[in-house]
Design a protein with these regions (language model features):
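Phosphate-group recognition and catalysis centered on beta-loop-alpha active-site segments
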Residues: 1-262
Length: 262
């Protein structure tokens, strides 16, 4: 029997392991680093400018520490003036395609209801750009919004059936009432209904949820499980040799690959 091989996705294109380049986060340098250490995928957050330009940025302000700068409110030209180090998506995809690694895309926007009612789907616009650069079989989308996962899966079924759409489960309950926080956590441990309604074909779960129940559940229903964010050495050792896990996302891809392949 072939040995099970858990895939490794470099969180933020390996930013934490590589460190800053020139005083700022450099996803292009991160892609090169992640490829050199043997990662299978690069994870990155995609945001949408007001003019429809897609950019790679973990933070809403592009990482400059100014809350008055909001990527979604600015055109690409305006963003360049305020946060000149933000990388356009197409530049990153060209660099990623040259390495042969896959793209793990975390959506940081959603299509407004009015736009969706008029027939627009920003997530489908993004998917259309992605498949121009990357083999659809090497694209994974993670999102926690049902309308987003449904529209992505519907589009992929027709245009890119190999693309994976994963429902993201887990996250902060900060600011919620106690009762709402309990309901949220319960729905994360027992997400069957939410998953069915999402039309997703994979699950992306926080490592605690994966270990408590979701690894067993996803194996039972036969869908891939992506686990985030797996950083400690002992946790990497455990999950990288768990046949129930499809992929882990980590800030330390070099160590993860060494533990898996060593």
């Amino acid at each position: 029997m072939a040995r099970h091989r858990v895939l490794v996705s470099a969180h933020r294109c390996g930013y934490a392991e590589l460190g800053t380049v020139g005083g700022h986060e450099d996803p292009l340098a991160g892609v090169m680093h992640s490829a050199q250490v043997g990662a299978d995928y690069c994870e990155f957050d995609v945001r949408r400018c007001a003019d429809g330009t897609f950019v790679v940025a973990h933070d809403p302000d592009g990482g400059i520490g100014d809350a008055s700068v909001v990527i979604s409110d600015l055109t690409w030209d305006q963003l360049c003036e305020s946060a000149p180090d933000v990388c356009r998506l197409d530049r990153l995809l060209d660099a990623l395609a040259a390495t042969g690694m896959g793209a793990h895309v975390d959506l940081k926007f959603r299509t407004p209801a009015a736009i969706r009612e008029a027939g627009g789907t920003w997530e489908v616009d993004l998917a259309s750009v992605m498949v121009e650069h990357i083999d659809p079989a090497k694209i994974v989308f993670t999102a926690g919004v049902r309308t987003t996962t449904m529209s992505l899966r519907a589009w992929a079924d027709e245009h890119a059936p190999g693309m994976v759409v994963a429902l993201s489960i887990g996250g902060s309950v900060r600011g919620m009432t106690w009762a709402n926080a309990v309901r949220r956590r319960w729905s994360e441990v027992f997400p069957q209904h939410r998953f069915r309604r999402s039309n997703s074909d994979a699950v992306a779960a926080h490592f605690v949820l994966a270990m408590v129940r979701l690894a067993r559940w996803t194996t039972h229903i036969g869908v891939p499980l992506l686990v985030w964010t797996v950083d400690s050495g002992w946790l990497q050792r455990r999950l990288l040799h768990d046949r129930r896990i499809w992929m882990i996302t980590t800030n330390h891809p070099a160590r993860a690959v060494a533990l898996r392949d060593g």
